Swiss-Prot record:
This is Latent membrane protein 1. The keyword Transmembrane helix applies. It is a multi-pass membrane protein. Belongs to the herpesviridae LMP-1 family. It comes from Epstein-Barr virus (strain Cao). The gene is LMP1. Residues 370-404 are annotated as: CTAR2. The chain crosses the membrane at residues 24-44, 52-72, 76-96, 107-127, 140-160, 164-184. GO terms for biological process: symbiont-mediated activation of host NF-kappaB cascade; symbiont-mediated suppression of host JAK-STAT cascade via inhibition of host TYK2 activity; symbiont-mediated suppression of host TRAF-mediated signal transduction; symbiont-mediated suppression of host type I interferon-mediated signaling pathway; symbiont-mediated transformation of host cell. Residues 194-404 are annotated as: Disordered. A motif (Interaction with host TRAF proteins) lies at residues 204-208. Two regions, C-terminal-activating region 1 (CTAR1) and CTAR2, have been identified within the cytoplasmic carboxy terminal domain that activates NF-kappa-B. GO terms for cellular component: host cell plasma membrane; membrane. Its main location: host cell.
Length: 404
């Protein structure tokens, strides 16, 4: 499942919404200026228009609010601009109801009730948006109280029919919407990174390097398997903690090395992450008969306890280490050869740490007599090349002898 998610190509990101055209901004600014002039003319005039004058000035103020939202925060046109547009339609409906009679009046009242319910629903939706943006309960309560206070003051203005009171009510509505805009400007998701990088997913360049490494080393897979696991189907000569210069911590199931492939389809018996492996190297289970890798930090050995505090360079389950083993521990020794072309340390870890039995019950690794000699003089075959004259690996096999 994880491999499917890693191998799936990322979906194409949605292009960000660009700024509005200069012509649309110019038209909006012109309409905003005209609306402000008409609003000031209506409010400051000596007309005795009564309640209709209050509704006309309030409708112009709603148009001004919608234009301000369009110019400065177009992303809020859906919730906040829609709320202002519905309030504008309800205001125009009230102006029409003033001259309706009979059945048309009842129909207008029904439409007015439906419009008020729709405004209430959009207001609840807008409060949910504020809640998701991090608004506290007290902030939401303050917005609700300010909204209902503005409605009550508008009703009072309809009864008073005074120009100065209408001016104060309209400015209160403008301040309410501007306060919401300012709050969302400082608390909204601004400058979000749509291409969020997940550190658990492999880098595309790393995936390319892994595939090229696999294609280059497929021809040496059989010889590599014989050198590390010995002739025949017997147990391997040494565990993965001795590493090889040709291997690498790519942590993928297709690696031809015996380092750490972490997948059940590996061609080797080193670390395929399953309790049914024919070897005792790394079956990722606490009931293994060896002390190699039981996936627990309390193991008596220093091989692979899956913790970042291990003193060895064996396998602490991380692909970012400067060595060829895969240890992911902050206390690992520095790389031996920084000039390695693969970016790793270019060589196996300290053999004295891995070959010597550090008081654990693991014992020496599996060994062979090296060709039928004295059984008390075993040799270990290390590396990935078969003979010293192989052009693929100039280092050749490394032999290490144990003496009684």
């Amino acid at each position: 499942m994880e491999r499917d998610l890693e191998s799936a190509p990322p979906s194409a990101p949605r292009p960000p919404l660009g700024p509005p055209l200069s012509s649309s901004i110019g038209l909006a600014l012109l309409l905003l200026l005209l609306a402000l002039l008409f609003w000031l003319y209506i409010v400051m005039s000596d007309w005795t228009g009564g309640a209709l004058l209050v509704l006309y000035s309030f409708a112009l103020m709603l148009i001004i609010i919608i234009l301000i939202i369009f110019i400065f925060r177009r992303d809020l046109l859906c919730p906040l601009g829609g709320l202002g547009l519905l309030l504008l339609m309800i205001t125009l409906l009230l102006i029409a109801l003033w001259n309706l009679h009979g059945q048309a009046l009842y129909l207008g009242i029904v439409l007015f009730i439906f419009g008020c319910l729709l405004v209430f629903g959009i207001w609840i939706y807008f409060l949910e948006i504020l809640w998701r943006l991090g608004a506290t309960l007290w902030q939401l309560l303050a917005f609700i109280l300010a909204f209902f206070l503005a409605i009550i003051l508008l009703i009072i203005a309809l009864y008073l029919q005074q120009n100065w009171w209408t001016l104060l009510v309209d400015l209160l509505w403008l301040l309410l919407f501007m306060a919401i805009l300012i709050w969302m400007y400082y608390h909204g998701p601004r400058h979000t990174d749509e291409h969020h990088h997940d550190d658990s997913l492999p880098h595309p360049q790393q995936a390319t390097d892994d595939s090229s490494h696999e294609s280059d080393s497929n021809s040496n897979e059989g010889r590599h398997h014989l050198l590390v696991s010995g002739a025949g189907d017997g147990p391997p000569l040494c565990s993965q903690n001795l590493g090889a210069p040709g291997g690498g911590p790519d942590n993928g199931p297709q690696d031809p090395d015996n380092t750490d492939d972490n997948g059940p389809q590996d061609p080797d018996n080193t670390d395929d992450n399953g309790p049914q492996d024919p070897d005792n190297t790394d079956d990722n289970g606490p009931q293994d008969p060896d002390n190699t890798d039981d996936n627990g930090p309390q193991d008596p050995d220093n091989t692979d306890d899956n913790g970042p505090q291990d003193p060895d360079n064996t396998d602490d389950n991380g692909p970012q280490d400067p060595d060829n083993t895969d240890d992911n521990g902050p206390h690992d020794p520095l790389p031996h050869s920084p000039s390695d072309s693969a970016g790793n340390d270019g060589g196996p870890p300290n053999l004295t740490e891995e070959v010597a039995n550090k008081g654990g019950d693991r014992g020496p690794p599996s060994m062979t007599d090296g060709g039928g000699g004295d059984p008390h003089l075993p040799t270990l075959l290390l590396g990935t090349s078969g003979s010293g004259g192989d052009d693929d690996d100039p280092h050749g096999p490394v032999q290490l002898s144990y003496y009684d």
